Amino acid sequence: MNSFLSGVKVLQVGDGIAAAAATSLLANLGAEVSKLCGGFSPSRVGPMIAVGAASVPLVDVVLDRGKRILRSPSDTSALIDAHDIVIVDHDAAIDPPQARNAVVVSVSPFGLTGPRSVERGGELIAQATGGMLATIEGSDGTPVPAPGYVALKAAGAVTALAALHGLDRSEHATGRLGDQFTTPLDGARS
């Protein structure tokens, strides 16, 4: 069966929710997705599921479904150039790669440049800066965060759209690959 992104190769670099949600969406559209792990497991909230002798956050099981998990290769640039789209998470602790043959989308809390670019983010920060935190109040009027990584998953959807836009622009409008985009989690454009 031919699907929308059949033949498109996507590489996820890092373990953040937004990047994982973006690549999960692209995988559901038919892309072949590989995930390059960072060597550490970020802490997650929510239900855990037993996988062998270990417990794994259910959100990771859901978002990593259908992905090929890779360990650090000896030649990262060759790995990057073997993909059409590379999505780099802000917690990956690497600079956004330069790619000759791929669209690179970086997910960061406040963009890659500017006065807040070095600040850490996360679900609560994304909900607060995006205005979502103001939509639910407790009985005493204080803000209540939405459960389930809602803001980071929404940022993942925007990241996937940025990747598809870059792919379309690179292949059809300019005839070249190698465009770079940034998806700040606070909703601002950088």
Residue positions per predicted region:
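N-terminal helix-loop segment corresponding to the beta1-alpha1 unit
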Residues: 1-179, 185-187
